[in-house]
Amino acid sequence: MRSPGTSREADTRADRWVRPLGWATLLGNVVLVITGGAVRLTGSGLGCPTWPRCTDHGFTPHGALNLHSAIEFGNRTLTFVLVVIAIATVVATMRSSRRDLRRLSIVLALGVPLQAVVGGIAVLTDLNPWVVSFHLLCSMAIIGLAVLFLWRHRHPVAAGHIRSGPVTGLAWATFGAAWLVLYVGTVVTGSGPHAGDATAPRNGLDPLQLSQLHADVVFLFVGLTLGLVFALRATSSAPGAVKAAKVLLAVELAQGGIGFVQYFTNLPVVLVGLHLFGAATISAAVTWTLLETRASE
């Protein structure tokens, strides 16, 4: 049995690792969105034509390694890095004094292999656009959970004293609109040209009509965010909540600008990749805004 002094020492050492590992989880999953986008935008979605193996012969590409195989295999390899980070995060929280973070660290750790399984199903279904859509949304959810983990680490007291009011209701509406934007965006992608492979099926929906719907939902999202900024200022809410809402609005405007430019320039891959990064940033920013608003009211 460890002495109290030894136990406190171990807790302190573990505490030092919790925050960096939380950031590693967040940034690693953002990178996974970017590399997953690279897989799709370069037509490398079936660079490893099966799952969980890369080919029928093994887990790594065999024979002449082409660019598509290298990109897809690199994306899969990143998942193993995220698994290691997730396990390290669970161990750190279990050994730290922050017992309130343990359950969330386990959820994050389970989310990584779940997301990988969904990716495997996407490969086994020849990049079915609905499965690919869900695959991306899983990453967005993990990014949001990583932000929640970091926020709770920073605000251990506030996390247990959350109240609700009209401004929080507006923040929830903004959060819901953000997720509607993300979902419709994946459906738009499923109808467009960047399928991940030349033979991959599309969802058969009209990309022009879907793009219009996506734009309409974005305008709703921006309007709600503007309303939230004004409501937070009018109610003299905590500076952290006002700052979070302003950052969210700035991210939305930048993301919307990229979206409009890519639409009118025939979806160049660089802009589509930036738009994917923007989507990951939206998920992080809207989660942060909701948490700060709930804590400030």
What name fits each language-model region?
Residues 1-297:
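Polytopic transmembrane helical bundles with strong interfacial aromatic enrichment
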